[in-house]
C-alpha cells in the first residue's frame, strides 16, 4: 500500500480535551512505527477552530483536505482520520456525521452507535433490549419538584444513588448521593452538564472492564481487568487522571473462568448488537453474589499511559500498533 495521509484529530474543546491530547500522544507514538503512515496532527478547540501542532490555522474541508489559512501553502489531502476526541464532539457521534457527509473513512464507531452509547438513557434502553443485565435506574428530563420527588423516592428505596448527567464521559457530572442533604445540589450540578439525567441505584460491587475490539475480521473481548478504588469512593474523573489518585488497576481481574466468560460473552453481544466498530471499553459491575451488571460502554476509550484499553489488548497478546494499522488498512482496501 502506498503512503497514507492520516489526520489525527484531537481535543474537541470539551471537558475531556486535555485527556484527548494525552491519548493522541499515545496514538502518534504508535503510528510512528509504521513507515506507510504520513501523519498530520490537528487540534480542534471549543470554537471549532483547527490548529496544527506548530500553530498553523487550518480547516478540514468537504474536499477531504486540510486547507491552511496561509494561502501560499498547498492543501494537504486526507485519506483517513482518527477522531481522538473523548466526549463531545467525538464520542457523541457528531463529528462522524461530517466525515460520512464528505465520505472520509475514519477509525472507530459510527455516528449512531457512538451517540447511542454516549447517552446513558439510550444506552440503558439498548442494554435491556439486548437482554444484558444493567443497574436499576430512573430517567429525568427536567429539574423540577416532580423530578426532585422522584429522586428522593429512589434514594429512600435504594439507600444510596448515583446522579449522572446523561451525556457526559469520564464520570463528568456524576455524583454519589447517600443523604437527602446532597440530593438537590447534585441534581443541579448534573443538569448543568446535560439536559437529561439518570438516577441509578448504587451497586456495591467490583468494577471490571473489558477491551472489545475488531481484529482480522473478528470481534475480540479480553479477559476482564479491574479498577480498585479506595473505600467509599468511585472511579471519578479525578480518580482516573489525578497524579495522586489512590485507584489501582489490574489488567486481569481475579475472577472465576465462568464469570470471565460470561462477561466476555456480554461484551461481544453488545458490541455486535449496538454495531460498534474497531474499539470499545465495556465496563461491568460484579456483585458479591456474582451478579454481572453492565455499567457503560466507551466508544473511544482513553489511550493514556495509565489507560486500561491498550494494557488489556496487549495482555491479550495483540500488539497495539499492529491492531491499529490492520484496521486502517482493511478499511481503506474495502473503501
UniProtKB/Swiss-Prot annotation:
Cofactor note: Binds 2 magnesium or manganese ions per subunit.
Stretches of the chain forming a coiled coil according to its record: none
Binding-site positions, Mg(2+) 1: 283, 296
Encoding gene per record: ddl
Pathway connected to this protein: Cell wall biogenesis; peptidoglycan biosynthesis
GO molecular-function terms, A-Z: ATP binding; D-alanine-D-alanine ligase activity; metal ion binding
NCBIfam families membership: D_ala_D_alaTIGR, PRK01966.1-3, PRK01966.1-4
Ligand binding (ATP): 154-209
Function according to Swiss-Prot or TrEMBL: Cell wall formation.
Biological processes annotated in GO: cell wall organization; peptidoglycan biosynthetic process; regulation of cell shape
Cofactor dependency: Mg(2+); Mn(2+)
Residues annotated as binding Mg(2+) 2: 296, 298
Pfam families hit by this protein: Dala_Dala_lig_C, Dala_Dala_lig_N
UniProt KW Manganese keyword: yes
Residues in ATP-grasp domain copies: 124-329
Catalytic function, reaction form: 2 D-alanine + ATP = D-alanyl-D-alanine + ADP + phosphate + H(+)
Chief location category: cytoplasm
EC number(s) stated in the UniProt entry for this protein: 6.3.2.4
The protein's name: D-alanine--D-alanine ligase
Keyword annotations from UniProtKB, A to Z: ATP-binding, Cell shape, Cell wall biogenesis/degradation, Cytoplasm, Ligase, Magnesium, Manganese, Metal-binding, Nucleotide-binding, Peptidoglycan synthesis
Amino acid at each position: 500500500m502506498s503512503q497514507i495521509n492520516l489526520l489525527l484529530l484531537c481535543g474537541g474543546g470539551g471537558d475531556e480535551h486535555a485527556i484527548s491530547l494525552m491519548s493522541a500522544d499515545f496514538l502518534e507514538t504508535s503510528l510512528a512505527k509504521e513507515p506507510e503512515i504520513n501523519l498530520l496532527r490537528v487540534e480542534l478547540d471549543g470554537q471549532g477552530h483547527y490548529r496544527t501542532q506548530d500553530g498553523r490555522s487550518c480547516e478540514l474541508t468537504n474536499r477531504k483536505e486540510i486547507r491552511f489559512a496561509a494561502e501560499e501553502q498547498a492543501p494537504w489531502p486526507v485519506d483517513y482520520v482518527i477522531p481522538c476526541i473523548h466526549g463531545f464532539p467525538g464520542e457523541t457521534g457528531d463529528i462522524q456525521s461530517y466525515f460520512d457527509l464528505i465520505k472520509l473513512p475514519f477509525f472507530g464507531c459510527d455516528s449512531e452507535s457512538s451517540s447511542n452509547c454516549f447517552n446513558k438513557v439510550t444506552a440503558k434502553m439498548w442494554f435491556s433490549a439486548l437482554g444484558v443485565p444493567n443497574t436499576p435506574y430512573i430517567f429525568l428530563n427536567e429539574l423540577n419538584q416532580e423530578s426532585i420527588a422522584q429522586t428522593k423516592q429512589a434514594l429512600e428505596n435504594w439507600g444510596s444513588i448515583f446522579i449522572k448527567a446523561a451525556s457526559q464521559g469520564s464520570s463528568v457530572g456524576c455524583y454519589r448521593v447517600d443523604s437527602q442533604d446532597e440530593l438537590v445540589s447534585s441534581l443541579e450540578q448534573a443538569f448543568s452538564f446535560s439536559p437529561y439525567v439518570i438516577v441509578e441505584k448504587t451497586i456495591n460491587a467490583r468494577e471490571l472492564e473489558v477491551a472489545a475490539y475488531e481484529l482480522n475480521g473478528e470481534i475480540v473481548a479480553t479477559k476482564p481487568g479491574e479498577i480498585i478504588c479506595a473505600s467509599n469512593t468511585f472511579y471519578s474523573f479525578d480518580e482516573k487522571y489525578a497524579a495522586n489518585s489512590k485507584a489501582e488497576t489490574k489488567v486481569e481481574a481475579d475472577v472465576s473462568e465462568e464469570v470471565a466468560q460470561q462477561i466476555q460473552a456480554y461484551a461481544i453481544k453488545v458490541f455486535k448488537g449496538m454495531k460498534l466498530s474497531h474499539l470499545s471499553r465495556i465496563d461491568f459491575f460484579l456483585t458479591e453474589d456474582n451478579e454481572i451488571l453492565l455499567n457503560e460502554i466507551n466508544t473511544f476509550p482513553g489511550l493514556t499511559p495509565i489507560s486500561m484499553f491498550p494494557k488489556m489488548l496487549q495482555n491479550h497478546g495483540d500488539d497495539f500498533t499492529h491492531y491499529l494499522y490492520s484496521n486502517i488498512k482493511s478499511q481503506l482496501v474495502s473503501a
